[in-house]
Amino acid sequence: MFNITISKILARQILDSRGYPTIEVETILSNDIKAKACVPSGASVGKFEAVELRDNDKNFYNGYGVTKAINLINSEVAPQIISMNTLNQEKIDNALIEIDGTDNKSRIGANSTLAISLAIAKAAALALNIPLYQYLGGITAKVLPTPLINVINGGMHADNNLDFQEFMIIPNGANKFEDAIRMSAEVFFQLKQILKHKKLNTNVGDEGGFAPNIRINTEVFEIIIDAVEKSGYKMYEDFSLGLDIAASTFYKDQKYKFADYELNTQELVEYYKKIISQYPIISIEDPIAEEDINGWKLITQELGNKIQIVGDDLFVTNCKLIQNGIDNNMANAVLIKPNQIGTLTETFNAIRLAQKNNYNVIISHRSGETEDTTISHIAVATNCGQIKTGSLSRSERLAKYNELLYIEKLLGISAIYYGSL
């Protein structure tokens, strides 16, 4: 049983939720067990993320093809991984890192290494006849994460005029994950009716949230709060608000350039302090640009004991950058995106480092997603307590929520809902 080895690795090109090519890898074991994994792709990408290998041939999928990566997997990487013990995830991932040979996966691509890494982990779980979350986390894996649900999209995730990228509802008052999803769906339904009544657009963005043309951010807060209350729930007690600012996308010449005005770092931090005092906002992601280091120190000093301050572009799931943030008191939470680093082992190392230093951890999807549900299992395996995987529309987002509902049923009375952040 424990000598089950990898007999085949097959890569192919598929499409993600935006219609862009991505990689699917199928692993076949020596006992004929098969498992597949697909990798996502981001729109707002941190400067220090591991490299996603693309063809850059404008005559083929406008340059977004991944045939180079697939050919590398099938012809070069697979022969070096075949015959390895399926259950030795760390050894396999280290081999992938060594085969690539660069600091940022630029030779074979983090999209290549991650697809292989995830497919092998899935196959190993099947070989042991246990759920993936249990294979990754053991018998202590039982915490269902609080979802940070993106109900209004803006920024680079939608064709509207909102500066901020995500406006999220957080069902912190639910008793179990199933209730959290039901409550959030009821708010989402109500939100659509309110937007229609205001004659605002109810088309959805990349992550399934509505994408209305609203000029003022605080108007979005008011609309979401109205939806929560009309659904019969209370702010703070049942729901809170979260934001993903994606500040790096509008930071230029040491200024934060919004559509109608610009602010320096101090003024932006003061703006955050103001809205936090006026609205039930408990989490802000990427409130400061990744290169504005003094700004990160300032906002953590000013607000770090009041709300969750999440680093995404600042950390990009990289242990060195997370350690630098810890050492310099920047942020108090880390967003984890496996495709930012490229292997399951490195992803878990980043999670453990954050948890060891009392930083909150949020497992996250990307704006260009697939039906793969591995991040749902990673969230439960690590007991991290939070997940971001979009809104309550678009099946590539709902697949993750539905998988968590299934995991909650598998865990039965052992399941614990994380709840308040």
UniProtKB/Swiss-Prot annotation:
One of its GO terms (cellular component) is phosphopyruvate hydratase complex. GO terms for molecular function: magnesium ion binding; phosphopyruvate hydratase activity. Pathway: Carbohydrate degradation; glycolysis; pyruvate from D-glyceraldehyde 3-phosphate: step 4/5. Its cofactor is Mg(2+). The active site is at E207 (proton donor), K337 (proton acceptor). (2R)-2-phosphoglycerate binds at Q165, K337, R366, S367, K388. It catalyses: (2R)-2-phosphoglycerate = phosphoenolpyruvate + H2O. It is found in: Cytoplasm; Secreted; Cell surface. SMART domains: Enolase_C, Enolase_N. GO terms for biological process: glycolytic process. Binds a second Mg(2+) ion via substrate during catalysis. Its EC number is 4.2.1.11. InterPro entries: Enolase (IPR000941), Enolase-like_C_sf (IPR036849), Enolase-like_N (IPR029017), Enolase_C (IPR020810), Enolase_CS (IPR020809), Enolase_N (IPR020811). Mg(2+) binds at D244, E285, D312. Disulfide bonds: none annotated. Keywords: Cytoplasm, Glycolysis, Lyase, Magnesium, Metal-binding, Secreted. Catalyzes the reversible conversion of 2-phosphoglycerate (2-PG) into phosphoenolpyruvate (PEP). It is essential for the degradation of carbohydrates via glycolysis. Belongs to the enolase family. This is Enolase. It comes from Ehrlichia chaffeensis (strain ATCC CRL-10679 / Arkansas).
